[in-house]
Amino acid sequence: MRLHLCLIALLVLIPALHGQEAPYFVTYDHHLEEPGNLEVETSTTMGIPRDGQRFYLAPYAEFEYGVTGRWTSELYLEGQSTAGDSAVFTGWRFENRFRPLAREYWINPVLYVEYEGINEASRIQKEVVGNAPDIGEPNSEASQTHAHEIETKLILSSTVRDWNIAENFIVEKNLSHNEGLEFGYALGVSRPLATLASGDKCRFCRENFNVGAELYGGLGSTRGFGLHDTAHYLAPVMVWQVSDNVSLRFSPAIGLTHESNPVLLRFGYSYEFHGFGGRVAKLFGGKP
C-alpha cells in the first residue's frame, strides 16, 4: 500500500513541478560530464538490516570522463563488507551515456549502456531491478557466483523553471544465467535551494545546496512482470557543492516493501579535475 501511495504522489507532483541539474544516487538526468573533465567519486551504501539479517557496507569508486559534449563514460570498482562475515571485491562496471539530440528540449532523452562483471555479493544497489536479492547468503558463497550482465536505460529528463524531473526505465540481461530480462525504474525530482547567487563567497550559501527525492525499484522480469517480491525505496537526497571541484551527497532511503532493506544510507564525495583530457594530451605531446 505504501508503494502505491508513493507512486501516485510522485506522478501527481510531476506535472506541477518546475528543473535543474541534480546529482542523484540512482536516477540519471540528461546532464553529462563536461568534455575533457574527469570526476572521481567515492560512494558508500550502508544496508540497515531486518531481524535475522546482517548490516553491510558496500563502497564503490567511480571515474567519470566527458568524452564529448554528448558522450560520457564511467568505470566503477566496487566491494562489500558484511558484519560478522567478510569483506570481498564484488566486481567492476563500464558505463556509457549518449545524448542523441544536441539541443535541449522539453523532454531530453539519453541512451545508457553498461557492462557489468560482478558477483552475487554486490550490494551497492546503483540500480534496483528484477526481484529482490537474497542478502542472507554468506559472502564466501555469493562471491563465487559470477555474472556478466548488460544493462540498458532510457533516460528522460526535463528542466522546468527551477526543477529537474527525471524518469529512468531499466532493462537488464544476465549473460551468465538464463534469467530472462529484468526490469526496473527510477524517478527523481530536485531543485536548488536558491537560484540566484548571494554575492558573498561562502560555502554554506543556499545556492550551494540541491535537494530532491528519488523513487526506485524492481519490476520483475519476463518470467514474472510486476511488483511481487520486489524491492522499492523512497529517498530524499541532498547535495552540497563545497567548491568548484568538490561536492558531498547524502541520501537516507526508506524501504517500502518487506523485500527491501528497512533503510539504505548513502554517502558520496566527488572531486572534479577540470581540463584533465587536455593536460594528459599535452603530457604526451598531443593536441588538447
Where in this protein do the model-derived segments appear?
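Transmembrane beta-barrel domains of Gram-negative outer membranes and organellar outer membranes
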Residues: G19-P288
